[in-house]
Swiss-Prot record:
Coiled-coil stretches: 671-696
Biased composition (Basic and acidic residues): 1-10
Domain-level remarks: The UBZ4-type zinc finger specifically binds monoubiquitinated FANCD2. The KEN box and D-box are required for interaction with FZR1/CDH1 and essential for APC(CDH1)-mediated ubiquitination.
Name by which UniProt lists this protein: Fanconi-associated nuclease 1
A biological-process GO annotation: interstrand cross-link repair
One Gene Ontology cellular component annotation held by this UniProt entry: nucleus
Cofactors demanded by this protein: Mn(2+); Mg(2+)
Keyword Nucleotide-binding: no
Stored PANTHER family: FANCONI-ASSOCIATED NUCLEASE 1 (PTHR15749:SF4)
The record's account of how the chain is modified after translation: Ubiquitinated and degraded during mitotic exit by the APC/C-Cdh1 complex.
Amino acid sequence: MMSEGKPPDKKRPRRSLSISKNKKKASNSIISCFNNAPPAKLACPVCSKMVPRYDLNRHLDEMCANNDFVQVDPGQVGLINSNVSMVDLTSVTLEDVTPKKSPPPKTNLTPGQSDSAKREVKQKISPYFKSNDVVCKNQDELRNRSVKVICLGSLASKLSRKYVKAKKSIDKDEEFAGSSPQSSKSTVVKSLIDNSSEIEDEDQILENSSQKENVFKCDSLKEECIPEHMVRGSKIMEAESQKATRECEKSALTPGFSDNAIMLFSPDFTLRNTLKSTSEDSLVKQECIKEVVEKREACHCEEVKMTVASEAKIQLSDSEAKSHSSADDASAWSNIQEAPLQDDSCLNNDIPHSIPLEQGSSCNGPGQTTGHPYYLRSFLVVLKTVLENEDDMLLFDEQEKGIVTKFYQLSATGQKLYVRLFQRKLSWIKMTKLEYEEIALDLTPVIEELTNAGFLQTESELQELSEVLELLSAPELKSLAKTFHLVNPNGQKQQLVDAFLKLAKQRSVCTWGKNKPGIGAVILKRAKALAGQSVRICKGPRAVFSRILLLFSLTDSMEDEDAACGGQGQLSTVLLVNLGRMEFPSYTINRKTHIFQDRDDLIRYAAATHMLSDISSAMANGNWEEAKELAQCAKRDWNRLKNHPSLRCHEDLPLFLRCFTVGWIYTRILSRFVEILQRLHMYEEAVRELESLLSQRIYCPDSRGRWWDRLALNLHQHLKRLEPTIKCITEGLADPEVRTGHRLSLYQRAVRLRESPSCKKFKHLFQQLPEMAVQDVKHVTITGRLCPQRGMCKSVFVMEAGEAADPTTVLCSVEELALAHYRRSGFDQGIHGEGSTFSTLYGLLLWDIIFMDGIPDVFRNACQAFPLDLCTDSFFTSRRPALEARLQLIHDAPEESLRAWVAATWHEQEGRVASLVSWDRFTSLQQAQDLVSCLGGPVLSGVCRHLAADFRHCRGGLPDLVVWNSQSRHFKLVEVKGPNDRLSHKQMIWLAELQKLGAEVEVCHVVAVGAKSQSLS
């Protein structure tokens, strides 16, 4: 052991402390950097005593606990007088500095602490610690701490690197000290004091000691710990991680909780605040460090909640606190980008877990979303929006409100993990499959927190054999199948699951052992052992949050995947809005009507919505039998519910709000049930369901035309019942809810039946048949080379493109082939947009009326892309005066006015999300203006009138192409039909109507020819 008096005259060879095994290289590094022997003694990070460097670990383990510590009076913690004399910088250890340095800020010190400060300056200062920097306050706190012994790592090499870097900056530090005044009363900042003490404390514990496990952190910062260097007053601080620092910085300073949380790092900790060369700054930090360290160690040792920041006894004025700036915040975190130390693995493994924060200090209260990842921010915005609405909160009982409160009381990592799991499908998940490194490297404590709070279930509650089997992978199932000697242990996963479920239902042969578990219990036990630890979010809390999300996004159609995976689409919308990447039109939210009468009404609606989602998912996957069983179950539920007294009030709701009732959802399910039965060729059952749907007029009246049309087809084509078919057609044509294409379809079927010889005896039934005349339009035919292909996919054609000197062959659709034909015919401009072309012009010309104020209940939340009554008759009736006036203006407007109106809306609203407007439909505003100039007022006015009067039934069937000549303003509206394609009834009606309005329309038929034929004729 080295002599404690002074360093040896001649340094003996010693073992390198570096990780590297190249002793020569390590020795050269130390000699070149220090040019003398390393210090014989180091300061103990606990008691600040000078200890021989090689006895530091033994001192901490055996001797340090028995030493006396300097007791600090908490009342003395405060600011120091500014007239403290300067201290020679040579007495301060030279350490690492960052390449970029900023002048230190002026520090105003209070006059009440000058004497004590001067006394402390005279104390001995070690090369790495000031002797008066007390880390533990009393003996009891020390005894409660557990100090682990870890390797010193590459301490010598690190110190040498710091020495070289710091030596280069010493002159600049002295210049900073000479240029900064000794007193300034205008720049005292609270973050300077708080962060100076806290960061300095962590600096001394983490950097200058090899005992890097003596670091305490906020429980909400269970992130990956990657050390980084920060400079403050010629002291080096290795932060736990930049990610953890950023998390604590943002969470600890959220407006709603800044008074209740201890700040580890302030956003105003910038490098221009860190380079301090005067002893005044050091004394301030020494004085302020004591109280903060005391609190942090008390939190760890006693396992208690964090106390409010007011107990820190550091008082500053409001003006000083307000001196923080966002610019400083940005510069701080852009400059702190240091590389991790070589032995940071030890640090990652040895940092202890600290206590969870209370709601007041968890930084996760309602609306406080700054610093959270995108998914948690979106989730908190949804919660805040619904919780702030009194009508919505009446739909939750006290227990459910308590669940939301518990969520806010979770730590930040707990909230993150729960939202991640909430967005996944509701099923059991193996612990080994849970990997969210951005939340925590070790999710075990987070899962334990969620389990204790009642948000997660563990495998101890997994008792359903089918769920366990679904949890197993295919190899695991095969292994289990071999254990139970199944007939086909190497079969597909679903086959093995079915085989196990069948085996579990068999009765045991050994009937004498009544206490023996059945075969199902044995399979369950073996399967659970094979699956290992697993978790699933609890259904109760998940249902509460699902209903909250449902209320938030009630006006959006809930997609199948969203219903199964926690509304990912809605959360993504919230995120994009918060990021400024999505903006909705400006309108006034006006909620007058209560859609849900009580909590039970909302629960029934949510259950029906999820049932519809499950059925739609089964249909999309082709599982028709499964979809049939689900639909039958839903039908039974609806039959028990449809006469409930609470449903009678649904009839009084306007149609655009009635679609958010449980009866509407079950009616949609029964309509899907008809499709399922028809796919399974069960036409008798389908007819009965259609007749049942048509017997009521409360729910889904906009679907009545489709139901009548399908009923007539089933009776006529599949069941060959002519008389019921004719009666069905007659009743359907008399129904005012049967519109446009469906009405024309029923009429044409009636005409075919009337002319059929087999229906002569039913001619008397056609006497009341109303006449419908649809004018035919021009038809042209072109040819194209069809690309050979298999299956029923869309036709693909081969077309010659490019210049005549350099032709190229391309594959194209039938519409692109038609565009090429019209381009050669003199139409230099063309758009293939179908209905979106006209709906975009409709939205641009009537934007202000579509989103006008004064109509109750059509705008109910902040993320609507259209008014709720857009697809109902009430849209036109409630805006009739404004619409009639605008349509007349459009009809009579000259070309310049049309162009100006389109330009005005384009410039004011471009990019905003509106369901009617596709901003990418036109290549530019100029193209949109050119098109309205060609179409003219009468055509535009007529199209807009039809869309405004019945958007639900008129949005489909518009022509595929709009082509025009930019010079002559000559245009055509073209419907393109490929091989084996024909016009739909809606397309026939639109073509005839556009022709009446004065537009030149035609149908372009594309005939396929052989590959060796010409591309176009």
